[in-house]
Amino acid sequence: MIELFYEYMFPLTVIALKVVAITIPLILCVAYLTYAERRVIGLMQLRRGPNVVGPFGLLQPIADAVKLLFKEPIIPTNADKILFILAPIITFVLSLIGWAVIPFAKGVVLADINVGVLYILAISSLSVYGIIIAGWASNSKYAFLGAIRSSAQMISYEVSIGLVIVTVLLTTGTLNLSRIIEAQKTLPWWIDLMLLPMSIVFFISVLAETNRLPFDLPEAESELVAGYNVEYSSMGFALFFLGEYANMILVSAMTTTFFLGGYLPPFNLPFLDCIPGFFWFVLKVMLLLFCFLWIRATLPRYRYDQLMRLGWKVFLPLTLFGVVLVSSVLFYTDNLPSV
């Protein structure tokens, strides 16, 4: 019996504890990211933001969660009820399981697999299905049009994201995210400089991938009322909401891992090694999240034709050229990584 416990139950218990240790703090971060967004945008617009519920409004996310929890879930009469309920669950779960391969610090990762990049790309591709199912199951023209827009937008920019990641893989020679971070310790400065335009394209593309301003066309209120989640209320709406903000944090962590050295100190300065890597990882993610909020507060929304033109006629040729340029430079300077 004891052997059975140590062989089967103990590993499963450890995995469950790791999942809980990541999921609960992540949900809290998502909740308070909404608070930070409202406060930051409020300050940028010369107003206070939420400041009534609790000291400095710190209990506002909890109040919002309680309100949504006790609201009546309304399902449209002609909706496909099973798919209608399933869609927000799919979206929220996919936004969480992507964190399994993200290294928070050296050796601190839930699943240190050798195909971590492929895992991330697969999860980001699957998230389209939750949105399509929501638009279809709602039996609403507004929701369906918002879902079609969102899926077309996400698929379009996934191409650019994938090609940018290829340039990173060319310089590091591995699909393991922990090894990608460690490889950035020894990269020459000119390779980092060569990847700088690619990192900018990547960040703009993940803005479109997460449906954030200036690319929040699926939620264009003047055209689609509220997008693919127009028929959702109560916890269904809350799960979509949490999924969107969890994806914001996830893509910020991906950008940190691929281009900012992950948990490594800035510029790989040796005297900063005494500070835990987790601190640097969180700091870099927070700076990128601030950029998300800053962009939302300052930029107007693109038209849909401008959005698609940017993805297919600007970013796709640019990233293809980037892949050819990076591979050629690495080949002729004999800096291709040995696999």
Swiss-Prot record:
It is an enzyme of class 7 (translocase). Keywords: Cell inner membrane, Cell membrane, Membrane, NAD, Quinone, Translocase, Transmembrane, Transmembrane helix, Ubiquinone. GO terms for biological process: aerobic respiration. Its main location: membrane. It catalyses: a quinone + NADH + 5 H(+)(in) = a quinol + NAD(+) + 4 H(+)(out). Disulfide bonds: none annotated. GO terms for molecular function: NADH dehydrogenase activity; oxidoreductase activity, acting on NAD(P)H, quinone or similar compound as acceptor; quinone binding. The chain crosses the membrane at residues 10-30, 50-70, 82-102, 115-135, 155-175, 187-207, 235-255, 275-295, 311-331. It is a multi-pass membrane protein. It holds the Pfam family NADHdh. InterPro entries: NADH_UbQ_OxRdtase_su1/FPO (IPR001694), NADH_UbQ_OxRdtase_su1_CS (IPR018086). Its EC number is 7.1.1.-. GO terms for cellular component: plasma membrane. It is found in: Cell inner membrane. Signal peptide: none annotated. The keyword Metal-binding does not apply. Belongs to the complex I subunit 1 family. NCBIfam families: PRK06076.1-2, PRK06076.1-6. NDH-1 shuttles electrons from NADH, via FMN and iron-sulfur (Fe-S) centers, to quinones in the respiratory chain. The immediate electron acceptor for the enzyme in this species is believed to be ubiquinone. Couples the redox reaction to proton translocation (for every two electrons transferred, four hydrogen ions are translocated across the cytoplasmic membrane), and thus conserves the redox energy in a proton gradient. This subunit may bind ubiquinone. NDH-1 is composed of 14 different subunits. Subunits NuoA, H, J, K, L, M, N constitute the membrane sector of the complex. This is NADH-quinone oxidoreductase subunit H. It comes from Rickettsia typhi (strain ATCC VR-144 / Wilmington).
